[in-house]
Amino acid sequence: MGKKSVSFNRNNYKKRKNERTEPLPRRIFKNDKPSKFKSKRKEKDKNSDAYDEMLLNNNFTLLDQEEPMVEIGSKKSRNDNDSEGIRDKGGVEISNKNDPYIQFGKADPLEPLEKPDLPEEAIKRGEPTILLGIPKREGRKTNPVHDKAVENNSDFIKFDWNSDEDEDSVSNDKSKNNESLKKSSKNEIPGFMRQRGRFFHEANEKSDSNRKRKRQAYELDSQSCPWHRQYKVEREVSRIFHQDILHFIDYITPTPEEHAVRKTLVSRINQAVLQKWPDVSLYVFGSFETKLYLPTSDLDLVIISPEHHYRGTKKDMFVLAHHLKKLKLASEVQVITTANVPIIKFVDPLTKVHVDISFNQPGGLKTCLVVNGFMKKYPALRPLVIIIKHFLNMRALNEVFLGGLSSYAIVCLVVSFLQLHPRLSTGSMREEDNFGVLLLEFLELYGKQFYYDAVGIAVHNGGFYFSKKKMGWLKPNQPYLLSIQDPVDFQNDVSKSSRGLLRVKATFANGFDLLTSKLYALASRIEREGVNRVKDFPSILSTILSVDEGVRQHREHMLKCYKNNPVPLEPLVEVDALASIDVDKLPLQDVGLQYVEDESDSDETDAAKDDLFKVNESIETNGHENFQKQALTSTGEQSSSNSRANPSKLFNISSDDSEDEVPIIEDTTASDEESRAKKIRKRF
């Protein structure tokens, strides 16, 4: 085969020189021939560009530029050679000259168009093609149009008043109407009245579809709101709301079977831990101990090791995790050693319950006793806490690491709300009968009214608000964070890690708005329909709460676990029978306050004085006897008492810090000392 002769110019020389410098594989496999795919693609793009240009110009400018023109009302074109249609430069057929779309598209917009001959049925139906003046390409058999457009109501556009559920009935109605339209008689009803008559005639059929819709809505409500039951006849919506809350609490409370399965899991984990370390003790704390847990809540455990043999190092955590996994008690194991409280997180393969194990953290045990004491004092605490926990759990705001509120923080919020409620403190309202009102006011307080930037919450000593600035808990970059003083440890801020408090606040505010609008709607419905229809009203809590399929499946799984391994059922312990601590009656030493005694010149003490003070007797050089009083309070006690804010001045907190200065040592007489001790006792 002969070689192609190439002109030896400068450009070809540079091209050949560059090819020599390229790597050998690239020179071997290089193909100078154009790709078939690219060429086809270019042709396709070229053809589509002409069609797109025609669409953009609305068939006017493109046709003006072309020589073959189609005249209106004439069968001849200027280009007789191309009788089949108009083609562009690429040979693509744009359209046929006899195509009505070109005729009407090329027409003068000021010249009225002749109405094409279309079927009478299409005119009666009022199809859009008639209104546009463009017939269909594949039309039915054409008949001359009678000049009775107004009588037949040809310009009437009908709307579909039926729902998607009644598609079959709509198609049947269309066929019946088409048959009736074909019949022409002198007594035929005009089109306008026929359409209106059809609308009223289908009222009975629509009632059937409404029944279907109501039945489906009831089925949906029973699935998402399994707690809903018929209400008792009440005229006040607050009482109806109270019934709905009782129904929800009764449904969401764990059954004895579920509680027994969790207790069995605790015993199995306890045996495994003692098998590894016989000298430690395993305790349960958290919501399981206080009976405030939801069906999908975690199980909180703590391992307390003896002083002589400490357990809880990183190595011990990994050893225990491996041991539990080896015994098939743990799956999806996570050992978190970098947190403030190192824990082991895992899931029980049998019950699918999430478990958290911590080491040497006795504060959780004290917390359980304090929460039990609050539940004994405030009957509305348990239902409100359970509803708020489920409300935040649905929105992923109940986990601290996600920026939400912990269960303990929610308990403290509800306790503070009940402690400082004006009507509850005066006894003008009972908690047991007003769960709905209290829930609304809780959402309104912490969603719309509470001043997070300056106010902190304390629940010990009857509950009070304090200034975050005076306490030293105000963060300049995040002043909106919630501050809750731990009644067990006054130096601990329970909600300091809840970074997403703005989302929590907005969620509370939206919940209040939704419930308020729902209650107003129910009140107006009672006025319209009467009190007897109250029992059929939907759930009020369904506006903010629901139970998803995962919760129902988990509860069914727990019931299956109990049936496979039945154990003797124990009745749930009543709140009054729980071990508890009342922080209002407890000595301050037991809740984390440490008393520091200052050094004195004398060792003699007065044992008859109050427990909060200790008086050291000293004799000065002048011979007079004076008493030196030393206020034995910790920094936590000082900050909580001195920075105590008046609840009535919650939103107008003074920035003056002069009140924070309290004299620690002063000379006084014995009579003055007794009077000051009485004042201090009143404050606590």
UniProtKB/Swiss-Prot annotation:
Residues reported in the UniProt entry to bind Mg(2+): 298, 300
Biased composition (Basic and acidic residues): 19-35, 73-91, 108-127, 171-186, 199-210
Family, as annotated: Belongs to the DNA polymerase type-B-like family.
Protein keywords: ATP-binding, Magnesium, Manganese, Metal-binding, mRNA processing, Nucleotide-binding, Nucleotidyltransferase, Nucleus, RNA-binding, Transferase
Record's protein name: Poly(A) RNA polymerase cid14
Cofactor (UniProt): Mg(2+); Mn(2+)
Primary location class: nucleus
Record function comment: Required for 3' polyadenylation of the 5.8S and 25S rRNAs as a prelude to their degradation in the exosome. Involved in the nucleolar organization to ensure faithful chromosome segregation during mitosis.
Gene label: cid14
An individual GO BP term: polyadenylation-dependent ncRNA catabolic process
GO cellular component, one term: nucleolus
Positions of the UniProt region annotated as Disordered: 1-52, 64-127, 161-219, 623-684
Cited InterPro entries: MTPAP-like_central, NT_sf, PAP_assoc, Trf4-like
